[in-house]
Amino acid sequence: MLDVKLLRANFEEIKQKLAHRGEDLSDFDQFEELDTKRRELIVKVEELKGKRNEVSQQVAALKREKKDADHLIKEMREVGEDIKKLDEELRTVESSLDKIMLSIPNIPHESVPVGETEDDNVEVRKWGELPEFSFEPKPHWDIADQLDILDFERAGKVTGSRFVFYKGLGARLERALYNFMLDLHVDEYGYTEVIPPYMVNRASMTGTGQLPKFEEDAFKIREEDYFLIPTAEVPITNLHRDEILSADELPINYAAFSACFRSEAGSAGRDTRGLIRQHQFNKVELVKFVKPEDSYEELEKLTNQAEKVLQLLELPYRVMSMCTGDLGFTAAKKYDIEVWIPSQNTYREISSCSNFEAFQARRANIRFRREAKGKPEHVHTLNGSGLAVGRTVAALLENYQQEDGSVIIPKALRPYMGNRDVIQP
């Protein structure tokens, strides 16, 4: 959520910046009208309350003098009715204004490239050499089928499309990867490990920006107003909702492993095979609460920490700076880390690292004090995938595949795989 005072003072400038996102700003245009009306109603209500207090004092004075005050009592009742009507009108206006504020996306940071689609994203850097094969590289689902480590067909029978069973060394590989990721982030970078709830309430989904705009993309529990989490970002960010932290506590860094649940409502026909786009998948999420002046330095740190996973696994990747049209609703700046997928001859997203500035903190009411009696300020929140585990499995199977159908296990992962160095058919 944006700062109302900032929006009021810089309406046209902010509107121009948001226009670069390419989103519908029809609701945004109503802000000025409703905000003006709200302030006018508040003035009227306060004036009438002042008048009512004045008349009340006059009534009391007349009664002390044992004089007739019926005409003033009648006037006071009429003023009370007027206040009641204006209060109802004010509540309606404020409700409409709140809906608009929740629908306005974040302002892109000045360093974000202006563009409309993913084609306008800017490559920041690349790492690693692309593998060379003496044979036609297979897609990871064919490799996994030959190794008997993933079962999409039976998952389709048990649940439906975009689900998978991990089996045998496939399950061991998945577990090895998220344990390896957690150990790196906790032991090397000092994150606090958290296991979050996999269901959250409406306030939590609103706090991080999934609601109300993207409710149709979420899995909702029918009997309760709960949602399956699309990412651990939601419960971990809301861990400090409605709290005032002290400056001494910042930065706060959490690393969380969780299952994630996504409807993929807008992805019909895309990535229908394999692990790239599943309704349920595992992810290690990194979440930061920082002072505003530190947030962009922390974004670089966060991105580098996510990159380190791929470097240790020796998987080639590139880092992309997302343009304004591909930034997402909540981020002020976002980097995507894309890993090389040989069978597709392209890079695919495996992590997004974002700085939300105060956007989520304002929605979730997360603040801090620089001094014990200082005025509370909103923290800046950041998060990034460290990494999406299923996509890492896909990248590993494809980049380390051998002509005989086996897959070499990266050296960094072998201690987590019982010191195996290869998965054989």
Swiss-Prot record:
Kindly state which reaction or reactions the protein catalyses: tRNA(Ser) + L-serine + ATP = L-seryl-tRNA(Ser) + AMP + diphosphate + H(+); tRNA(Sec) + L-serine + ATP = L-seryl-tRNA(Sec) + AMP + diphosphate + H(+)
Identify the pathway.
Aminoacyl-tRNA biosynthesis; selenocysteinyl-tRNA(Sec) biosynthesis; L-seryl-tRNA(Sec) from L-serine and tRNA(Sec): step 1/1
GO MF term (any one):
ATP binding
What residues does ATP bind to?
A: R262, S263, E264, E349, I350, S351, S352
Query: Taxonomically, which superkingdom?
Result: Bacteria
Q: A GO CC term?
A: cytoplasm
E.C. number: 6.1.1.11
Functional note: Catalyzes the attachment of serine to tRNA(Ser). Is also able to aminoacylate tRNA(Sec) with serine, to form the misacylated tRNA L-seryl-tRNA(Sec), which will be further converted into selenocysteinyl-tRNA(Sec).
- According to UniProt, the name of this protein is Serine--tRNA ligase
- Name the gene for this chain: serS
